[in-house]
Amino acid sequence: MARRGGAAASSSMANLLGVALVLAATAQTSARGGGGGGRHDYRMALSKSILYFEAQRSGVLPGNQRIAWRANSGLADGKANGVDLVGGYYDAGDNVKFGFPMAFTVTMMAWSVLEYGKQMAAAGELGHAMDAVRWGADYFVKAHPAPNVLYGEVGDGDSDHVCWQRPEDMTTSRQAYRLDPQHPGSDLAGETATALAAASLVFRSSNPGYANQLLQHSKQLFDFADKYRGKYDDSMPVVKKFYGSFSGYGDELLWASAWLYQATDNRRYLDYLANNGDALGGTGWATNEFGWDVKYPGVQVLAAKFLLQGKAGPHAAVLRRYQRNADVFACSCLGKGGGGGNVGRTPGGLMYHQGWNNLQFVTGASFLLAVYADHLAAAGRGQAVVRCQAGPAARASELVALAKSQVDYILGSNPRGISYMVGYGARYPRRAHHRGASIVSIRANPSFVSCKDGYASWFGRAGSNPNLLDGAVVGGPDGRDGFADERNNYQQTEVATYNNAPLMGVLARLAGGGRGGLAEAAIKRPDNQTLLPPLAAAASPVEITQLNATASWKKDGRTYRRYAATVSNRSPAGGKTVEELHIGIGKPHGPVWGLEKAARYGYVLPSSLAAGESAAFAYVVRGRAAPPPADVWVIGYKLV
């Protein structure tokens, strides 16, 4: 019942590169049908994926509310703190408003509209999608009452999770938690800046005054995030076990700068993206996960887009390094990475990361693959490929095919023949872990449901939820394609806004049957830009040198070899120091000397490397004959 506590697992910067897997064959492009396999009605699924957000609304519901079983809720949010925090979205199956995943949700909804707004319009859904973006953006304007103040949470996860109540009946804490210069949160402030920058583009043509308001808040939040650095879960410990910032704030600062460049064309933000790529990890980290915590692949795809569109300015060399990491992400999803970090697959072909809400990563990856493929294809034949470490280069069409196969799996083309989108197809989850959907609607029975009565009378019911949570995507199956439709099985049946937000973009793309209309290309940019002088780009200073085997022995018919290696900081004298250096070693067998096992993946150098310094390490490999050295690569580092 905790949030994506598994999203803690989400934050791995992931082992990259790995074992080749076979890309599952995919079904035809535009299709009709229901959950259970074969062809799918992407337009219907798109409509439902957007409709779901109306079930997650907090605050005073509008007159055009389509989810009729919901009513007003959270009407005193922020009152005790002297600020109006009414509105926004509940994150998943509970009644807390967590700012971090909500901001990522708004970012991905806005990006979906920007890339595939024309397809949404053709399906009659663009207005609904823009309403969904605005519902979140309006809340973040309220949550940012001063340049260096941001409210990041309303409610308390601990007290909320001991209650099972409709949001309309809430009796749990509605305390609000904030960031300020004494309590910084660069990750949360950076992601909120990103959401508002992306949302400003959505409304640039239809409501320029509102768009400018969003952009002003975005700029202030970015400056706040950059000037007062720190992790938001250190300033707001109450959030740590629900939506902890495990990847740190470097990705959000780069993410925000990239989106502000997209929204303004102001070279200040492009310079920031380029000049901080090493220090904040954008050019160093390569990962196979993308979600509410880890934004690096999103930054890298966006940087690649700038490069492909000729918007790199003097920073083409640095943006190419970003693009190489975007390629690593794509290749890892395709099973064409190298070194042991490909995304796993279930027997039925679903990309698989973890048991808790795995589909959040599937929808996020599918969106990035589709967007990256479309921009590669738009750039021309010579650039419409991704070069992978293991296996032949991948065409843009392969990325789209993979994204489509994952969406088809979610909609029912899977071994169980079940749609993991509630309300789509004949077979779908009937007992989603969701308080509002699982208790009789307050409109049907206005009798108060207490904290404990909800558990006693509704949570444990064997029957289907009384209210249809139409369009919600649940956590999904396990690594063997297994799924138990039980309300208490929150790892598989809980829904989340960030599962749906990227999916709506992919569904629009598939419903349109072709490449995105790139709606943002027609949006008029402000012309009062301030151009700052560029700073020089630099190549990565970290270098690994593999040495010969230093020892060899046999055991149980296998040969073992110990190999030595050195890692060096090639920065010139007086240059920057390398810290938090993470190194990947492909399948060592035995101890590793000179490095420490990292908390989640790979190994970490226990000390920093000043300019010109080197450090030695060693590892063991085994084989039938004389085993060669393992693949060794730099996962990431910081320059200080």
UniProtKB/Swiss-Prot annotation:
Chief place of localization: secreted
Assigned keywords, A-Z: Carbohydrate metabolism, Cell wall biogenesis/degradation, Cellulose degradation, Glycoprotein, Glycosidase, Hydrolase, Polysaccharide degradation, Secreted, Signal
InterPro entries per UniProt: 6-hairpin_glycosidase_sf, 6hp_glycosidase-like_sf, CBM_49, Glyco_hydro_9, Glyco_hydro_9_Asp/Glu_AS, Glyco_hydro_9_His_AS
Reaction catalysed by this enzyme: Endohydrolysis of (1->4)-beta-D-glucosidic linkages in cellulose, lichenin and cereal beta-D-glucans
Protein name: Endoglucanase 1
Domain of life: Eukaryota
Subcellular location(s) per record: Secreted
Enzyme class: hydrolase
Active site: D94, H433, D485, E494
Known tissue expression: Expressed in roots, leaf sheaths and flowers.
EC numbers, comma separated: 3.2.1.4
UniProt keyword annotation of Lipid biosynthesis present: no
Species annotation: Oryza sativa subsp. japonica
Signal peptide positions on this chain: 1-24
GO cellular component: extracellular region
GO molecular function term, any single one: cellulase activity
Gene3D superfamilies in the record: 1.50.10.10
Family according to the record: Belongs to the glycosyl hydrolase 9 (cellulase E) family.
